[in-house]
Amino acid sequence: MYQIVLGKVSTLSAGQLPDALIAQAPQGVRRASWLAGRVLLSRALSPLPEMVYGEQGKPAFSAGTPLWFNLSHSGDTIALLLSDEGEVGCDIEVIRPRDNWRSLANAVFSLGEHAEMEAERPERQLAAFWRIWTRKEAIVKQRGGSAWQIVSVDSTLPSALSVSQCQLDTLSLAVCTPTPFTLTPQTITKAL
């Protein structure tokens, strides 16, 4: 089973939240997205299992809980991928111009990924950049790795993992799962 839920950070992190949750939340710019992620998780699973953190900081449920999850946010949108199949990774990005995105692609994309981007019409290359970027991030996150490892990932090569991506309006969403799964708009639930 794979469950994908999208929500709005501003909505999920506002309103009446349990004092214990607010006390655990980090301060600063990560606070709203952290709270939104915990709210999404608690809506999907009640009671919420105890959480632990991996070597690179990836949150997970404690041993003995046969569920895995991954969270990602960009702008005001947050994505939750929940699984009973094994470790998962997801990445969501708002498709937006970014300073020196071509230089970044040259630095971290494989030859195959670069060829995929360059094969697009010029007006579609920015969307292709984000499509490839989200796939790479989802793979790294599935492994529990750090952002620095993105350069070592080639999302165009065959893999034992399943990597799927879709574009939703101005959002690029990718998932990396241990068993076959195809991401489509119909497989995504929107949080209220």
UniProtKB/Swiss-Prot annotation:
Keywords linked to the UniProt accession: Transferase
Domain of life: Bacteria
Keyword Transferase: yes
Catalytic activity, EC: 2.7.8.7
GO molecular function: holo-[acyl-carrier-protein] synthase activity; magnesium ion binding
One Gene Ontology biological process: lysine biosynthetic process via aminoadipic acid
Keyword Coiled coil (UniProt): no
InterPro entries noted in UniProt: 4-PPantetheinyl_Trfase_dom, 4-PPantetheinyl_Trfase_dom_sf, P-Pant_transferase_sf
Chemical reaction(s) catalysed: apo-[ACP] + CoA = holo-[ACP] + adenosine 3',5'-bisphosphate + H(+)
GO CC list: cytosol
Role this protein plays: May be involved in an alternative pathway for phosphopantetheinyl transfer and holo-ACP synthesis. The native apo-protein substrate is unknown.
NCBIfam families named among the record's database cross-references: PRK10351.1
Entry similarity comment: Belongs to the P-Pant transferase superfamily. Gsp/Sfp/HetI/AcpT family.
Protein name from the UniProt record: 4'-phosphopantetheinyl transferase AcpT
Organism of provenance: Salmonella typhi
Classification lineage: Bacteria, Pseudomonadati, Pseudomonadota, Gammaproteobacteria, Enterobacterales
